[in-house]
């Protein structure tokens, strides 16, 4: 199949990244990619969707991944998967010899392994420059559900009209279900039995980078999980704090320990983001050196600094996000052509173990099986948002 033909099929069937920002998948198909990489790292704690889907549909997904490899002419296809996903690895190994040029790369159980910049370095040794795209290093990254959606578009002529979503935490029966796009979060949560706390909060996405949602919010193409949490949970409290309070707390109790920078995944890959310098400058309203503010553009918002590193429970990630938003509104673009410094020699010792992260966040008790149910959940009506991805909104037909 030619690249243009596959691009047209993918675009016409509405396939975008099934997580993150929802980058249009057809735009990743280019003959500049000498390596394609499938992301099965489940970036966030408690998420199990991708390993479940890849185990259940291993052959179909691998076949499609190989087809993408041949279409773009990539010399190598890598499946990045955490070494603890034993059942999924076994399912892949049953078919791996059928696909020349494809290999598994086993990953450590650390966060944020699913960040594509981190994943690319782990799997290939290449460093994507600050503000750059993976294709600049000859790599195109796809997550598991996205590849499965390409399979359904090519083989079954099926557009993306449904989504796999995990429902976990304070529910009686944690589950991963297939639901129509546009159904409400409440309808999805109902598939997991009863909520087990009064006045639950729906946290959409993972605990590190997710957001607080309303029960009436619609499921979109990037909705991966709903965490049902008590209203007084640590994660909920952190999300509900205001920037003005965060800034005052930084000015009064930051101890200048530098741990937020020491553990920053992007900083350790040589990117110029430096949360400690930013917090010091912002807390003291110090504008003599603008670099800490400008370099906020290179923050990935992974949340390690805010949710794990800081012994004072400050909020570097939230303040950096506000700064990025302010720079965009002011028309200030990230510096172009910035090259990374050498990767930190101590990077291996600065990784965040996912098990320890879950304990720090008070999530360990929620780490339970959430079985995959593939029968499509039936609902009476849906609300389809036209903008479910990066770029121009879709058009109704």
Model-derived features: where do they sit?
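Conserved phosphate/anionic-ligand binding catalytic regions in large, soluble enzymes, centered on
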Residues: 14-30, 307
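Histidine-anchored nucleotide/phosphate-binding helix
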Residues: 36, 56-72
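Gly-rich Lys/Arg/Thr-decorated short loops/hinges at beta-loop-alpha junctions or inter-strand turns
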Residues: 38-50, 171
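Flexible, glycine/charged-enriched surface loops at secondary-structure junctions
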Residues: 72-79, 196-205, 264, 289-292, ...
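Active-site loop ensemble at the mouth of alpha/beta enzyme cores that anchors a bound cofactor
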Residues: 111-139, 215-245
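Ubiquitin-like/PB1-type beta-grasp interaction modules and other compact soluble beta-rich domains
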Residues: 165-170, 196-230
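Ferredoxin-type iron-sulfur electron-transfer modules in oxidoreductases and energy-metabolism complexes
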Residues: 229-251, 261, 267-351, 358-374, ...
């Amino acid at each position: 199949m030619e690249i243009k033909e596959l691009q047209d099929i993918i675009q016409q069937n509405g396939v975008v990244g099934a997580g993150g920002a929802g980058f249009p998948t057809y735009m990743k198909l280019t003959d500049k990619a000498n390596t394609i990489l499938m992301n099965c790292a489940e970036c966030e704690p408690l998420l199990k969707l991708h390993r479940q889907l890849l185990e259940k549909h291993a052959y179909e997904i691998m076949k499609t991944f190989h087809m993408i490899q041949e279409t773009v002419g990539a010399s190598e296809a890598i499946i990045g998967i955490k070494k603890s996903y034993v059942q999924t690895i076994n399912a892949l190994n049953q078919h791996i010899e059928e696909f020349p040029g494809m290999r598994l790369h086993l990953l450590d159980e650390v966060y944020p392994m699913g960040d594509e910049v981190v994943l690319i370095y782990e799997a290939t040794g290449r460093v994507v420059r600050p503000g750059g795209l993976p294709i600049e290093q000859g790599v195109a990254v796809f997550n598991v559900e996205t590849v499965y959606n390409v399979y359904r578009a090519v083989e079954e002529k099926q557009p993306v009209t449904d989504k796999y979503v995990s429902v976990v935490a304070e529910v009686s029966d944690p589950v991963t279900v297939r639901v129509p796009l546009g159904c409400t979060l409440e309808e999805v949560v109902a598939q997991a039995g009863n909520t087990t706390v009064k006045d639950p909060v729906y946290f959409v996405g993972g605990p590190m980078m997710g957001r607080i949602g309303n029960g009436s919010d619609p499921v979109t193409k990037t909705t991966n999980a709903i965490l049902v949490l008590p209203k007084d949970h640590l994660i909920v409290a952190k999300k509900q704090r205001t920037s003005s309070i965060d800034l005052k707390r930084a000015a009064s109790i930051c101890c200048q320990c530098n741990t937020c920078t020491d553990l920053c995944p992007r900083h350790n890959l040589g990117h110029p983001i430096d949360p400690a310098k930013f917090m010091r400058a912002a807390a003291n309203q110090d504008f003599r050196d603008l670099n800490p503010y400008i370099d906020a553009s290179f923050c990935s918002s992974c949340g390690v600094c805010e949710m794990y590193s800081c012994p004072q429970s400050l909020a570097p990630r939230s303040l950096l996000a506000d700064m990025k938003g302010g720079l965009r509104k002011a028309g200030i673009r990230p510096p172009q052509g910035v090259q990374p410094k050498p990767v930190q020699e101590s990077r291996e010792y600065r990784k965040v173990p996912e098990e320890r992260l879950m304990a720090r966040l008070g999530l360990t008790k929620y780490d339970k099986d959430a079985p995959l149910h593939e029968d499509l959940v039936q609902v009476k009506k849906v609300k389809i948002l036209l903008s479910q991805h990066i770029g121009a909104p879709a058009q109704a037909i």
